[in-house]
Amino acid sequence: QQRYLNAKRYVKLAIVADRSMVTKHNGKLKKLRKWIYRIVNTINEVYRSLNILVALVYLEIWSKEDLINVTSAAKDTLASFGNWRATDLLKRRSHDAAHLLTNIKFDGTTVGKAYVASMCQQDSSVGINQDHSKINLLVALTMAHELGHNLGMSHDVVNTEKQCNCGTCVMAPTISDQISKLFSNCSKNDYENFLTLYKPQCILNEPSKTDIVSPPVCGNELLEVGEECDCGSPETCQNPCCDAATCKLTSGSQCAKGLCCDQCKFSKSGTECRAAKDDCDIAESCTGQSADCPTDDLQRNGKPCQNNAGYCYNGKCPIMLNQCISFYGSNATVAPDICFNYNLKGEGNFYCRKEQATIFPCAQKDKKCGRLFCVLGPTGKRISCKNTYSEDDPNYGMVDLGTKCEDGKVCNSNRECVDVNTAY
């Protein structure tokens, strides 16, 4: 748990500057870009104390017209920006969070707004920020504050039960000229709770050099184009393989970090660098030619797993018993065959396939690839065939793809029970 909490995190940030920002900078896009690069450099500095690096991986400037309606109503603007990000931006460019920078003044004293504990979520990992000051640092601290909300942090309130021992930290409820670059204990606790509760996966992945669109800065701990390594400032760098002042490897070093870097040299070929997580995963070993561990590889689809209870499918071992337990708890088991006969009817929620409004009943041989049936506890003479469904998600409560439906057979994407050797 402590190792999970202490791991370095990387927020891959996309920033969108709207039309009002272009007007504010008199159409000088180079000047506007510089302004934004400075903002991101400051945000990265602020977050390094939490072992988080913030990298700008995408910058979009709406120089002709805004792609959403940016208004003084912050709540509405945030909602439309979140929707646009999910339906448009994410399809074009991979990133962890997107923030809008605008010169439109929001209602009241609001200078920014973001969804709380939303990092890595498709529709809510967003924030909006008003470019409210001539002082770059103050705008940067506003965006750092809104990003803090995405990472699960609430405002620092100074009251008796929640003494945050900081009136001017990043998550202070209102911005002031006294604001500091520090996080309060409350913010640190909020962030750790967010990591524990939500387990956001996307921020564990380090951006590659070529993903970062801002000019390289030696000493910001991010490995960028033109750098061989970056271990922070010469004062703080602890890495003997890297020359902090130049971001070049020290004499005789092959590497400065990586799962396959051992004392500044590439690990020997064959050294295991990532253990197999389970029987549908494969262990990876170093090549001897690189500091990086090869890409995480999975067992082939159809390989038997969990003592032949199932077959591997995309790195998982889907079996009906585990699906029942996930729906109904630990005393659930798979229902007897008689329950699965409901899937032969093709009525209501009992079927193998549904295309638009047309329902296709299961053939006898495919009945265990339709709706999943479970029972709770020991069954007497009367069997209660438990099943579940959702109006929003047609696959919810169905037997998972790749699940073993008979010996040597699995459910394919058409929900047919087919030979495991020809299914994939």
Curated annotation (Swiss-Prot):
Subcellular locations according to the entry: Secreted
Binding site for Zn(2+): 145, 149, 155
pH dependence: Optimum pH is 9.5.
UniProt-recorded Gene Ontology molecular function terms: metal ion binding; metalloendopeptidase activity; toxin activity
Entry superkingdom: Eukaryota
Chain residues that bind Ca(2+) 1: 96, 202, 205
CDD domains: ZnMc_adamalysin_II_like
Glycosylation positions in this chain: 69, 185, 331
Keywords: Disulfide bond, Fibrinogenolytic toxin, Glycoprotein, Hemostasis impairing toxin, Hydrolase, Metal-binding, Pyrrolidone carboxylic acid, Secreted, Toxin, Zinc
Activity regulation: Its proteolytic activity is inhibited by EDTA, TPEN, 1,10-phenanthroline, and some thiol compounds, but is enhanced by alkaline earth metal ions (Mg2+, Ca2+, Sr2+, and Ba2+). Its activity is not modulated by urea (4 M).
Annotated tissue distribution: Expressed by the venom gland.
PTM annotation, UniProt: Glycosylated.
GO annotation, biological process: proteolysis
Entry binding sites for Ca(2+) 2: 217, 220, 222, 224, 227, 230
Position of sequence motif D/ECD-tripeptide: 279-281
List of residues binding Ca(2+) 3: 281, 284, 296
Protein name: Zinc metalloproteinase-disintegrin-like brevilysin H2a
The organism of origin for this protein: Gloydius brevicauda (Korean slamosa snake)
